């Protein structure tokens, strides 16, 4: 795992997916299929927006979008993309939600946060998402799926230079989190986490592995066409991530 993906405290930040990656397209497609998640009357907050990919794709389907991230590495790229594509209802803000959210100064109708919760210092900081969501708002998050054969975020394993060892993610939690760069979840674990922090889970599904890590070619085309075709799967072993849609519990 490249060193630039860690901050000064050696905390793993991850690498954002590109706007053309299949995983991004699948996430947005699933949100569009969920009744009334998108709408030009809704304000939208993307927590951990990275390079802004999800925000860009949702911009025409929302009233306004704010993308926030713990670092501003992609701020110039985001602003350049917005200007180039004449998008006027989006903006970026550098915010560490685990420290201070006062600069946001509002609550939002819709929140998205893709592959972010596993990077929080304390997973219970998801309670802050609730503070940022309106009473009748909806939230969509995704987290890495424990039952995918490969460790999606890599690990610092002793004596092993390759950090994506098959089945490492299947180890018991106390062993996995000793070496892994990020937490990993089952449907049960992420549901319990959200419920513990004031959310009601409305929907969860396994996002089919997008095969973005493979080089373009015949093998990738065949895998996507025949084994990893649909946006979701009922087979957890074919899924890299879990998508959850939730609302504030009243």
Model segments located where?
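S-adenosyl-L-methionine-dependent methyltransferase catalytic module, highlighting the catalytic core
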Residues: 4, 8-23, 53, 70, ...
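Short beta-strand-to-coil "C-cap" segments at the C-terminal boundary of structured domains/repeats
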Residues: 246-250
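Short, glycine/acidic-rich beta->alpha junctions
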Residues: 47, 120-121
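Generic leucine side-chain signal with a strong bias for well-ordered alpha-helical environments
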Residues: 45, 132-133
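Surface-exposed loop/turn positions
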Residues: 42, 136-137
């Amino acid at each position: 795992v490249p060193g630039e993906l860690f901050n000064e405290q050696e905390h793993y930040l991850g690498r954002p997916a590109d706007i053309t990656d299949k995983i991004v397209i699948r996430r947005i497609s699933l949100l569009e299929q969920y009744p009334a998640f998108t709408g030009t009357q809704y304000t939208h907050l993307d927590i951990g927006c990275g390079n802004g990919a999800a925000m860009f794709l949702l911009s025409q389907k929302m009233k306004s979008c704010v993308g926030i991230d713990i670092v501003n590495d992609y701020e110039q790229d985001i602003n350049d993309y917005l200007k180039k594509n004449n998008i006027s209802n989006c903006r970026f803000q550098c915010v560490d939600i685990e420290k201070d959210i006062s600069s946001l100064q509002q609550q939002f109708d819709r929140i998205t946060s893709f592959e972010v919760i596993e990077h929080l210092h304390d997973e219970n900081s998801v309670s802050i998402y609730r503070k940022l969501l309106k009473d009748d708002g909806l939230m969509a998050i995704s987290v890495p799926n424990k039952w995918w054969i490969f460790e999606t975020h890599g690990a610092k394993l002793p004596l092993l230079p390759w950090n994506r060892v098959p089945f490492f993610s299947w180890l018991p939690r106390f062993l996995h989190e000793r070496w892994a760069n990020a937490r990993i979840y089952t449907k049960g674990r992420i549901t319990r986490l959200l419920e513990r922090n004031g959310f009601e889970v409305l929907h969860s599904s396994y996002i089919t592995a997008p095969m973005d890590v493979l080089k373009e070619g015949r093998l990738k085309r065949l895998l996507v066409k025949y084994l990893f075709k649909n946006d979701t799967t009922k087979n957890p072993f074919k899924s890299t991530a879990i998508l959850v849609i939730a609302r504030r519990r009243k």
